[in-house]
């Protein structure tokens, strides 16, 4: 098997990367330690240098194959190893997926993300999802897939089918990765990310906060994302949704200011990436989400469900956007 390692910028590099610097973990920690208002202000300045601060990219996420995943990730209700009451389902029919995509576009989404609860797809799965990708792409939607670990040639097949983005999160600080995920390691993630880049696909890569990590460990997650070379085009920042039956169901609540800080630090360290305010928004008051947008979040998951968990309804999101004078970003082939 060929191993593709997504290059991490080396500490020995004295000249910054043309588009991104190397971020030492201690430097990222210093950002987290800034006075809250100063941090938000700095992040807002960086955001305005690269984006229209009123524009929000809307993505709809659909689970096309739910439950029964053989992986053991302590945050995930889809693992077959946990009793969460979620039943394993077969893959959705192509026609049903396409209908969901049409609805998403009609409601204003510009990107359609499809997820499957696999450790990794089999060749026959790639054939099926490639057909789906082609049809969804023809609707005028940007396409994203999250299908797990990829074997050689699969990323190229997905690219050929018309996939724009591949989502593969780093989840948490590399130093604590195997405290959270027990059936794969950080290098496995990096290998698939390397294959995705090698195939010419754009990368969607983020993580989850609120899993009992410390602030330095949150800094480690952001540093690991910011030091991917090149940086991810999309960075979803998820707040843990605590699901009964998972090992993290009783995780300590993350203070809301710490989540906003994480958004701000992601914006500063990855100035040209779309920073997505991702899972956990149902528990976020409008004022908190507003601060996240001020701090540089410029993408949300849009639709009533995120894989298996609830998400704000479209009407409430549009109402909030109207209050804040935000507008949905239209899809153009040149967009990130």
Swiss-Prot record:
Biological process according to GO: biotin biosynthetic process
Domain of life: Bacteria
Keywords from the named record: 2Fe-2S, 4Fe-4S, Biotin biosynthesis, Iron, Iron-sulfur, Metal-binding, S-adenosyl-L-methionine, Transferase
Binding site for [2Fe-2S] cluster: 113, 144, 204, 276
Segments forming domain Radical SAM core: 54-281
Residue spans crossing the bilayer: none
Pathway per the UniProt entry: Cofactor biosynthesis; biotin biosynthesis; biotin from 7,8-diaminononanoate: step 2/2
Enzyme Commission no: 2.8.1.6
Catalytic reactions on record: (4R,5S)-dethiobiotin + (sulfur carrier)-SH + 2 reduced [2Fe-2S]-[ferredoxin] + 2 S-adenosyl-L-methionine = (sulfur carrier)-H + biotin + 2 5'-deoxyadenosine + 2 L-methionine + 2 oxidized [2Fe-2S]-[ferredoxin]
GO terms, molecular function: 2 iron, 2 sulfur cluster binding; 4 iron, 4 sulfur cluster binding; biotin synthase activity; iron ion binding
UniProt xrefs under Pfam families: BATS (PF06968), Radical_SAM (PF04055)
Gene3D superfamilies according to UniProt: Aldolase class I
Annotated PANTHER family: BIOTIN SYNTHASE, BIOTIN SYNTHASE, MITOCHONDRIAL
Family as reported in the entry's similarity comment: Belongs to the radical SAM superfamily. Biotin synthase family.
Protein name: Biotin synthase
Designated gene of the protein: bioB
């Amino acid at each position: 098997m060929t191993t593709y390692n997504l290059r991490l910028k080396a500490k020995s590099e004295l000249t910054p990367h043309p588009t991104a610097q190397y971020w030492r973990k201690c430097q990222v920690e210093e950002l987290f330690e800034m006075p809250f208002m100063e941090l938000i202000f700095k992040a807002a300045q960086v955001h305005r240098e690269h984006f229209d601060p009123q524009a929000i990219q809307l993505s709809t996420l659909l689970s096309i194959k739910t439950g029964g995943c053989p992986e053991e990730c302590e945050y995930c209700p889809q693992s077959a190893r946990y009793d969460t009451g979620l039943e394993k389902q077969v893959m959705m029919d192509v026609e049903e997926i396409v209908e969901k995509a049409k609805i998403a576009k009609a409601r204003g989404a510009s990107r359609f993300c499809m997820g499957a609860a696999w450790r990794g797809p089999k060749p026959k799965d790639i054939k099926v999802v490639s057909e789906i990708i082609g049809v969804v792409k023809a609707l005028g939607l940007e396409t994203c897939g999250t299908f797990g670990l990829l074997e050689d040639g699969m990323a190229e097949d997905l690219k050929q089918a018309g996939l724009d983005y591949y989502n593969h999160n780093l989840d948490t600080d590399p130093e604590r990765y195997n405290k959270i995920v027990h059936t794969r390691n950080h290098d496995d993630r990096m290998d698939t990310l390397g294959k995705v880049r090698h195939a010419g696909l754009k990368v969607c890569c983020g993580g989850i906060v609120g899993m009992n990590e410390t602030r330095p460990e949150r800094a480690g997650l952001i540093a690991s994302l910011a030091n991917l070379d090149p940086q991810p085009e999309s960075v979803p920042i998820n707040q843990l949704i605590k699901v009964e039956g998972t090992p993290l169901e009783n995780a300590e609540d993350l203070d809301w200011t710490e989540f906003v800080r994480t958004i701000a630090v992601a914006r500063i360290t990855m100035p040209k990436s779309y920073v997505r305010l991702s899972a956990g928004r149902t528990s976020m008051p409008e004022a908190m989400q507003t601060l996240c947008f001020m701090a540089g979040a410029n993408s949300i998951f849009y639709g009533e469900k995120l894989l298996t968990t609830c998400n704000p309804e479209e009407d409430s999101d549009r109402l909030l956007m109207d209050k804040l004078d935000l507008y949905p970003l239209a899809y153009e082939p040149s967009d990130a």
